[in-house]
UniProtKB/Swiss-Prot annotation:
Function: In physiological conditions, is crucial for intracellular hydrolysis of cholesteryl esters and triglycerides that have been internalized via receptor-mediated endocytosis of lipoprotein particles. In venom, the biological contribution is unknown.
Glycan-bearing residues: 34, 129, 159, 271
Domain AB hydrolase-1: 78-378
Protein name (Swiss-Prot/TrEMBL): Putative lysosomal acid lipase/cholesteryl ester hydrolase
Tissue specificity statement from the Swiss-Prot or TrEMBL entry: Expressed by the venom gland.
UniProt keyword Lipid metabolism, yes or no: yes
Coiled-coil residues: none
Entry EC number(s): 3.1.1.13
GO molecular function: sterol ester esterase activity
Length: 400
């Protein structure tokens, strides 16, 4: 009992100290900004669009049409579509400083950059028939993101830019839905010049970390804890903690370690001064059904279509008693992968399996020290990944 009291007093002292420090410093304005506002705040042009999917979800798309170095021209710039991962949003690509954010780096390198936002995250919570208060809104998983969100977003970008193809960059679940979409929808796959997979995830047989431990819980218990609608949304409590608690040096370490506990450790490669910005935008929420789908993958060791829990329901959805596997061998898009040696979610053993499944793999680089978040927030990402990606895109673009 006395230990708990002492710990509570110490924690309260840390919080009070952090709040006092925050009053002195002031809150970083980016903590309260949406994606478009962050882009403008950094001195880049910003556009925002709404895209309606085939099943009625209204997604937010953000655009950086040109950079500060590569200015607006009459000639169209090659389009790049960036797709975030699980519990994330399009801000992942722009919440670091200019040179450390892939979205800005690509814009400055001469690309027309588009940031996707999956259904159910902070910026994509509209539907033509349902509201977020209705359970019907939340009846989706990464399967629907692949089958509806990606086609709608890619087609919108191509129609808007007048181009026939674009580059696709996915991180984590963003690679999963890319793999599924481009293997199941061959006409969509033809519209992808090249697929860049960062911390790719297609099997989670050997994954570890906090999210995997959560996925190991029985389905009934997950529903009992989280309900059947939304899970881990960005909310007022998280924003308050991020803006009033994260920010002081010691507290920054604690806030940063929340991400490390979920994804792996590489603390020296995270800009701790940006943690409050990351924390006020991520997690950005998803559906409980999406987490249940990942839970099924954790327990089975493979990624299949969502298991509806009964032979009858699966027959209704798939015309077979069990959910079908995704056939990666049909994904013919030229693919380049970057993986991390310390990535708990995209484990080396799972990557070894994935490498055998991709028929048109043209490049793979493992960065031994990297974990799951280095691909979007790593301090050394420009030198160890951005440069190679941009060179590869230029080579492909100008070979056409």
């Amino acid at each position: 009992m006395w230990r708990l009291i002492i710990i509570a007093i110490l924690f309260q002292g840390l919080v009070n100290s952090a709040m006092l420090e925050r009053r002195k410093r002031g809150v970083d304005p980016e903590t309260a900004m949406n994606i478009s506002e962050i882009i403008l705040f950094r001195g880049y042009p910003s556009e925002e669009y709404e895209v309606v999917t085939g099943d009625g979800y209204i997604l937010c798309l953000n655009r950086i049409p040109y950079g500060k170095i590569s200015q607006k021209t009459k000639e169209p710039k090659p389009a790049v579509f960036l797709q975030h991962g699980l519990l994330a949003d399009g801000s992942n690509w722009v919440t670091n400083l200019d040179y450390n954010s892939l979205g800005f780096a690509l814009a400055d390198a001469g690309f027309d950059v588009w940031l996707g936002n999956s259904r159910g995250n902070t910026w994509s919570q509209k539907h033509i028939n349902y509201t977020i208060k209705q359970k019907e809104f939340w009846m989706f998983s990464f399967n629907e993101m692949a089958m509806y969100d990606i086609p709608a977003s890619v087609n919108f970008v191509l129609n808007k830019t007048g181009q026939e193809q674009l580059f696709y960059v996915g991180h984590s679940q963003g690679t999963t839905i890319g793999f599924i979409a481009f293997s199941v929808l061959p006409e969509l796959a033809k519209k992808i010049k090249m697929f860049f997979g960062l911390a790719p995830v297609m099997t989670v047989k050997f994954s570890s970390g906090g999210l995997v431990k959560l996925g190991e819980l029985p389905e009934f218990l997950l529903k009992e804890i989280f309900g059947t609608k939304q899970i881990f949304p960005q909310n007022a409590v998280i924003k308050w903690l991020a803006t009033h608690v994260c920010g002081q040096v010691l507290i920054d370490e604690l806030c940063g370690n929340f991400f490390f506990l979920l994804c792996g450790f590489n603390e020296k490669n995270l800009n701790m001064s940006r943690v409050e910005i990351y924390s006020t935008h991520c997690p950005a929420g998803t559906s409980v059904q999406n987490m249940l789908h990942w839970s099924q993958a954790v327990k089975s060791g493979e990624v299949r279509a969502f298991d509806w829990g009964s032979r009858k329901e699966n027959m209704a959805h798939y015309k077979q008693p069990t959910p079908p596997p995704y056939k990666m061998e049909r994904m013919l898009v030229p693919t380049a992968l970057w993986t991390g040696g310390h990535d708990w979610l995209s484990d080396r053993k799972d990557i070894a399996i994935l490498l055998t499944l991709i028929p048109n793999l043209i490049y793979h680089k493992e960065i031994p020290e990297w974990e799951h978040l280095d691909f979007i927030w790593g301090l050394d990402a420009p030198q160890r990944m951005f440069r190679d990606m941009i060179q590869m895109m230029h080579k492909v673009q100008y070979a056409h």
